[in-house]
């Protein structure tokens, strides 16, 4: 099984395309020069397109993904603000862009060729939205707003319009700073990593996906850590057994085991990373985790122990300058 790994390096305006084999080895396939500082990335649900947010000319660059994982530029569309995080709906019809510094979220349609078009809606006055996450039902968009300690909820219509959900928001602990989210593969539980206190909140999803209730909040840091907390990313393995978060000050990944129903997580350890692990991802087999070192200009591959979730460092690889984002495309037959 071979997968493609994409690493975005904004300071050198590049995407490095790697092939990941079943032993966890990476082979460089392509280095793509991007028209701007490349930051968030998202892969289409059919795994045939890569979407990339760029600045200072705010926009989305669409790429076609070849069978071997290499990229060909297919178009560029504007955005109303600097893209901080992007996501598509689960049918690949719309792209959502959260702009932290511009306090907005926009929706852009995706045409039948998989190319993102100009936005059709913009939601303003959102206090520092750090991500835009479509729920498992493809009906609700969840937007963690870091500066108000809330996760906003919006209904998504078939036409790509967002309106406030009946449960308009989820309030998190004061000063927590909600940032990125992940969903359990059973579609019944959501997780949110909080940037400012490096904690993870666990939400039970009920009423046919319509309601979110906090069931657990857990510190992700070592007990003796006294520095400034600065969490960044969160991902769960495809089998739902292990959850990971990164913290950029401590240069580590927090490792959690997850109960069978997804509702209870337990911190079982930490693993040191490259300097400032801004982004990471887990491959589709659930065997490997790849993290970027924003200050080391390298990525590192770790093997996931299937019995404990613990990580073993395999190898580090040079990439562009200031790598921030890691996206992984599944094997051709996946």
UniProtKB/Swiss-Prot annotation:
Keywords: Carbohydrate metabolism, Glucose metabolism, Hydrolase. GO terms for biological process: glucose metabolic process; pentose-phosphate shunt, oxidative branch. It comes from the Bacteria. One of its GO terms (cellular component) is cytosol. GO terms for molecular function: 6-phosphogluconolactonase activity. InterPro entries: 6-phosphogluconolactonase_YbhE, Cycloisomerase_2, Lactonase_7-beta_prop, N2O_reductase_N, WD40/YVTN_repeat-like_dom_sf. SUPFAM superfamilies: Nitrous oxide reductase, N-terminal domain (SSF50974). The keyword Cytoplasm does not apply. It catalyses: 6-phospho-D-glucono-1,5-lactone + H2O = 6-phospho-D-gluconate + H(+). Transmembrane segments: none annotated. The keyword Hydrolase applies. Pathway: Carbohydrate degradation; pentose phosphate pathway; D-ribulose 5-phosphate from D-glucose 6-phosphate (oxidative stage): step 2/3. Belongs to the cycloisomerase 2 family. HAMAP family: 6P_gluconolactonase. Catalyzes the hydrolysis of 6-phosphogluconolactone to 6-phosphogluconate. This is 6-phosphogluconolactonase.
């Amino acid at each position: 099984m071979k997968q493609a790994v994409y690493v975005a390096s904004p300071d050198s305006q590049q995407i490095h395309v790697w092939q990941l084999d079943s032993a966890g080895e990476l082979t460089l396939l392509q280095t793509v020069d991007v028209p701007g500082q490349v930051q968030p990335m998202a892969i289409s649900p059919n795994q045939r397109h890569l979407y990339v947010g760029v600045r200072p000319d705010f926009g989305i660059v669409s790429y076609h993904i070849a069978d071997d994982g290499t990229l060909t530029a297919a178009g560029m569309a504007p955005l109303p603000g600097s893209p901080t995080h992007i996501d598509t709906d689960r049918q690949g019809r719309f792209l959502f862009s959260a702009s932290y510094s511009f306090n907005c979220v926009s929706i852009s349609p995706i045409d039948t060729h998989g190319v993102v078009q100009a936005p059709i809606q913009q939601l303003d006055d959102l206090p520092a939205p750090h991500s835009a996450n479509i729920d498992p039902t493809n009906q609700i968009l969840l937007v963690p707003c870091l500066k108000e300690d809330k996760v906003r909820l919006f209904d998504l219509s078939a036409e790509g319009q967002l309106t406030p959900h009946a449960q308009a928001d989820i309030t998190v602990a004061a000063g927590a700073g909600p940032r990125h989210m992940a969903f359990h593969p059973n579609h019944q539980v959501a997780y949110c990593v909080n940037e400012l206190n490096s904690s993870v909140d666990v939400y039970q999803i009920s009423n046919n996906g319509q309601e979110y209730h906090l069931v657990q909040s857990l510190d992700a840091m070592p007990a003796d850590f006294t520095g400034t907390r600065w969490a960044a990313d969160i991902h769960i393995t495809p089998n739902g057994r292990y959850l990971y978060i990164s913290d950029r000050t401590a240069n580590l990944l927090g490792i959690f085991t997850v109960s069978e129903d997804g509702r209870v997580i337990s911190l079982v350890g930490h693993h040191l990373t490259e300097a400032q692990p801004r982004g990471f991802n887990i491959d589709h087999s659930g065997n490997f985790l790849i993290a970027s070192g924003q200050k080391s200009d390298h990525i590192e591959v770790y093997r996931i122990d299937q019995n404990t979730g613990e990580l073993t460092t395999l190898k580090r690889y040079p990439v562009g300058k200031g790598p921030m984002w890691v996206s992984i495309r599944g094997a051709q037959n996946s």
